[in-house]
Swiss-Prot record:
UniProt keyword annotation of Membrane present: no
GO cellular component terms listed in the entry, alphabetical order: extracellular region
Note: There are 6 heterodimeric myrmexins which consist of a small subunit (SS1 or SS2 or SS3) disulfide-linked to a larger, quite structurally unrelated subunit (LS1 or LS2).
Protein name stated in the entry: U1-pseudomyrmecitoxin-Pt1 subunit SS2
Length: 29
């Protein structure tokens, strides 16, 4: 259950990072 939530959250963050081009903040993901 928890792992699935983390995966969804990570996907949202990746999409946001791609949209906003926050390379430094998102390279850690």
């Amino acid at each position: 259950l928890f792992g699935g939530l983390l995966d969804k959250l990570r996907e949202k963050i990746k999409k946001y990072c791609n949209k906003e081009n926050l390379d430094k903040a998102c390279s850690k993901l």
